[in-house]
Amino acid sequence: MRSNYIVIEGLEGAGKTTARQLVVETLQSAGIHDMVFTREPGGTILAEKLRSLVLDIQSTGDEVINDKAEVLMFYAARVQLVETVIKPALARGQWVIGDRHDLSTQAYQGGGRGIDRTMLATLRDAVLGDFRPNLTLYLDVTPEVGLQRARARGELDRIEQESMNFFNRTRARYLELAAADPSIRTVDATQPLDAVARDIRATIAQWMAEQAA
């Protein structure tokens, strides 16, 4: 099977790290071992600096980051990662497993922030063209459950400290986007871990069978 780009998405506390391991195990059981792992924002020297700038609550002192400036920083980090890491890895025949990609911006900034969706789509198309993940696993969790898990991990970053209404809007946009795109598969991440693991493995296996057909 040719190389593919698989992305794991979801709110804070959805279980993306655990899901990544399950995806890896499922791929390995199918004989796929050459994988590259990415995260957004981040994954290159420049992108990691932008990550610190946009997520660290201390990064800009008392200066509030403008919503549109936030979007542009996310896209700057994303383009750098796609062009210098993801595309070259795919060209080498490696599989890429990503923690977040463009769906996060469409959900968090388009849903949570309320930024004009046409503008976001235009910007995405301008800088990414038709580049898209082959498969996106969206781990659906309520903000209440997700933030409770996130708080248990420790200090929250700048976006994790947003209001419950922000995360409700973000989740609603995630669900809307997932319903409209067959390359996005939704997993109920509020279930017990063994049930989530079962669903992730089944989703990956089904998708791989579809690709082989």
From Swiss-Prot:
UniProt catalytic activity: dTMP + ATP = dTDP + ADP
Molecular functions (GO terms): ATP binding; dTMP kinase activity
Binding site for ATP: 10-17
InterPro entries in the cross-refs: P-loop_NTPase (IPR027417), Thymidylate_kin-like_dom (IPR039430), Thymidylate_kin_CS (IPR018095), Thymidylate_kinase (IPR018094)
Class of this enzyme: transferase
Key words, A-Z: ATP-binding, Kinase, Nucleotide biosynthesis, Nucleotide-binding, Transferase
GO CC term, one of those recorded: cytosol
Origin superkingdom: Bacteria
Pfam families: Thymidylate_kin
Assigned EC number: 2.7.4.9
One GO-annotated biological process of the protein: dUDP biosynthetic process
UniProt-listed PANTHER family: THYMIDYLATE KINASE, UMP-CMP KINASE 2, MITOCHONDRIAL
HAMAP family referenced in this protein's UniProt entry, alphabetically: Thymidylate_kinase
Family indicated by similarity: Belongs to the thymidylate kinase family.
Function: Phosphorylation of dTMP to form dTDP in both de novo and salvage pathways of dTTP synthesis.
Protein name: Thymidylate kinase
Organism: Klebsiella pneumoniae subsp. pneumoniae (strain ATCC 700721 / MGH 78578)
High-level lineage: Bacteria, Pseudomonadati, Pseudomonadota, Gammaproteobacteria, Enterobacterales
Gene expressing this chain: tmk
